[in-house]
Amino acid sequence: MSLVTSLTYVLPHRLLSSLARALAYSNRPATKQWLIDTVTRKFGVDLSEAQEPDPRAYPTFNAFFTRALKHGARVPDADPAALLMPADGRISQLGPIENGRIFQAKGQSFTAAELLGDAGAAAPFNNGLFATVYLSPKDYHRVHMPWTGTLRTTVHVPGRLFSVGPDAVRNVPRLFARNERLVCHFDTDFGPMASVMVGALLVSGVETVWSGVEIPRYGDRITRKDYRGKGIVLEKFAEMARFNYGSTVIVLLPPGVATLDGGLGAETSVRLGQALARRQLG
């Protein structure tokens, strides 16, 4: 375990994330430009695909980090049966949900019930599929729909804010089931689908297209919001949310509806819109 990962056990997660949020939304020219220039240089951010390629045109660091892409910079897989990759990034892990457990790394796993904060909500995904996509600081930070779905409920599960970098994934037990997260449940034409937005150290919030910014909060109460009957339908490939700093999205699918794309595996670099899985039709 690296020194940085070891330190995350004792660092004041909330305080650091609150400070990061204040900096991210600062419109002081010197502050926001120093942050933008530092991150661009350190992580090799490519703005050539951005709708706004001028780094000095962004009013805040958060506006830069959640930047939109040019039209056509990402296109969905042409196969109508393809479920789409929800984001740019790298596959952390993917595969079957076996006996209700989701693989994290060698020697590490957690249950779907822990991740979703509800054993009943996890039951339909037993023996189904999962895909965990890590968004690094250089990536496009908007998350899109793998398939058309109607929003049913969201669940805000409080927790820690460990780093979700590769070293932490390998060494922090049940990492994604311990970090704060927003669980989004959708109804689709094949049944339930869940997209889980996992927070991390320095993540200043998750912003959804239906409710705006979800700011990390103190306390340990799970908060559920019911959207049934609201008619919130998000089409395949449509934006659903964005991270106000980098983190991880986990997609859960029920059994028997899709097969994972054969070219994917742990550590595979991926782009929004490529095939994640393909429907089992007929």
Curated annotation (Swiss-Prot):
Pathway: Phospholipid metabolism; phosphatidylethanolamine biosynthesis; phosphatidylethanolamine from CDP-diacylglycerol: step 2/2. NCBIfam families: PS_decarb. This is Phosphatidylserine decarboxylase proenzyme. Its cofactor is pyruvate. GO terms for molecular function: phosphatidylserine decarboxylase activity. It comes from the Bacteria. GO terms for biological process: phosphatidylethanolamine biosynthetic process. Belongs to the phosphatidylserine decarboxylase family. PSD-B subfamily. Prokaryotic type I sub-subfamily. The record marks 246-247 as: Cleavage (non-hydrolytic). InterPro entries: PS_Dcarbxylase, PSD-B, PSD_type1_pro. The keyword Cell membrane applies. It is an enzyme of class 4 (lyase). Its main location: membrane. Its EC number is 4.1.1.65. HAMAP family: PS_decarb_PSD_B_type1 (MF_00662). Catalyzes the formation of phosphatidylethanolamine (PtdEtn) from phosphatidylserine (PtdSer). It catalyses: a 1,2-diacyl-sn-glycero-3-phospho-L-serine + H(+) = a 1,2-diacyl-sn-glycero-3-phosphoethanolamine + CO2. The lineage of its organism: Bacteria, Pseudomonadati, Pseudomonadota, Gammaproteobacteria, Lysobacterales. One of its GO terms (cellular component) is plasma membrane. It is a peripheral membrane protein. Is synthesized initially as an inactive proenzyme. Formation of the active enzyme involves a self-maturation process in which the active site pyruvoyl group is generated from an internal serine residue via an autocatalytic post-translational modification. Two non-identical subunits are generated from the proenzyme in this reaction, and the pyruvate is formed at the N-terminus of the alpha chain, which is derived from the carboxyl end of the proenzyme. The keyword Phosphoprotein does not apply. The active site is at 88 (charge relay system), 144 (charge relay system), 247 (charge relay system), 247 (schiff-base intermediate with substrate).
